[in-house]
Amino acid sequence: MKSNIIDLKNSYPFMFAEGVSQSEIQKLVDVYHGLVSSQYQEFLKFSGGAIIGAYPLYGVSSVELMDAHFNTVSKVTNKYEDDGMIEKGRFLVISENHAGDPICLNMDGSVVEFSHDGFQEKLWEDFNGFIEWCADAS
């Protein structure tokens, strides 16, 4: 993890869940196959979920400030799949923007954002680029 993310966790521990075990991460990998990038797995070991800047980062654990019903990567991904906003099995919802649009890990490790208008845009090359952007925006 980059030092600025570690500094945020040290300064605002209530914004970060505890890291999770490799067995918990493996359960996620088993369900979502190629969508759980190595960078995202590294983040989950550091924090099972977080709020960085104004963005939730969904993991396998919840942060108290998150929505009580949609607060883990599995719950949020299932919600957007069920709503038909993302194609089932192709994306992993790791965050949402201020309009409630999903921000997802793609099969190639890039991070894409979907709009309610049906558009998909690749915004970051990888997960670390996304969380660095979140930290810089805070």
Predicted feature descriptions by range:
Residues 106-108:
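Short acidic-glycine loop/turn motifs at beta-strand connectors
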Residues 1-102, 137-138:
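A surface-exposed partner-binding patch
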Residues 65-66, 100-104, 118-125:
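Short, surface-exposed beta-strand/loop "edge" segments at domain boundaries and coil↔beta transitions
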Residues 70, 104, 129-131:
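Low-complexity, compositionally biased segments
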Residues 120-138:
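Compact, glycine/acidic-enriched structural inserts
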